């Protein structure tokens, strides 16, 4: 499927699900398509995922402290809308082929601006945005990048008296103009998100540099480049800006190799230190042993007569808190994974889609059970789920993880 066709599919998906934020998952979406660059802010419609936490220490190794830090990080509305869109699509079975395309991004990472304004009462002619992108893996293909800046024009700014305003995004190193657009002054005093395409410069920077910081600079001009406007009048200043209204760099990537959920856990292990993880593992191990002792066997007796039920899909409810993963997983906190269980005995049913090898093995087992075990009841089809989580650098990440839900079972 060509990039344009995939983008059209995605646009229709957003429209169908009632999500109206721009979401370029492909290079064509962020650098080739000239769509509206001003996205209305969602305001109070944002779901409250985080809670204010006064202080917590990540290096303490304490699980509750790590959970408190996770709770203090609130995802931007944009990341929540991405998660909700694709989670809903997965439930409806709409985006399976969409994400299987080699062009599609399966990971979207948001980096929050760490820059500071120089002076409170001085004119703001240039605004620098700094992002720590050190957690971005080298084993990913960068498919798109955009800078999203929340702005609300000051009430003292008279748009009708100034004429069109052009805002320009520049490289901090070369000061070359990367992107520019005319500020939409209609309903200018309503809050909105301005979106800039930074895919080319970010890809070049990642290719030639291994630094941890990515820097961009913003300025605004009137009818010629010499007449710059104080950015504070246009609402680009940082003073009094809450965390959820800070600028974010959104990077769209696709992993060059399949990653498991344990990849993020390993990255956090490196950050937390081995001692704390050793204690956590021992604690979880004791908990698991006590659960095995206290809880009855779900599958009945392990010894004696075997179950006669045939291979089929059975419930398996996964709770990330019980796994100890709720210190980094934002959503979902639980989901239905299902599992496969039952006998693969002769004759094998066609709906189990047995392989030729499984058919032969099952036939041999029926003739001589003591010498040949039966074929195994395993997942024959799996589907992905969307996960919104916090990475080792405390960045909010959306990722679609493959092979998370059993759709059907078979004998292998």
UniProtKB/Swiss-Prot annotation:
Intracellular or extracellular location(s): Secreted
Residues that carry a glycan: 95
GO molecular function, one term: cytokine activity
SMART domains in UniProt: TGFB (SM00204)
Induction summary: By shh.
Cysteine-cysteine disulfides: 311-377, 340-409, 344-411
Keyword annotations: Cleavage on pair of basic residues, Disulfide bond, Glycoprotein, Growth factor, Secreted, Signal
Domain of life, source organism: Eukaryota
Tissues in which the UniProt entry reports expression: Expression is correlated temporally and spatially with somitogenesis. At late gastrula stage, expressed in the posterior presumptive neural plate. During somitogenesis, expression becomes restricted along the dorsoventral axis of the trunk neural tube in an anterior-to-posterior progression so that upon completion of somitogenesis, expression is seen exclusively in the ventral spinal cord with the exclusion of the floor plate and adjacent neural cells.
Entry keyword annotation includes tRNA processing: no
Family per similarity comment: Belongs to the TGF-beta family.
Subunit structure and binding partners: Homodimer; disulfide-linked.
Name the record gives this protein: Growth/differentiation factor 6-B
Protein's organism: Danio rerio (Zebrafish)
Lineage: Eukaryota, Metazoa, Chordata, Craniata, Vertebrata
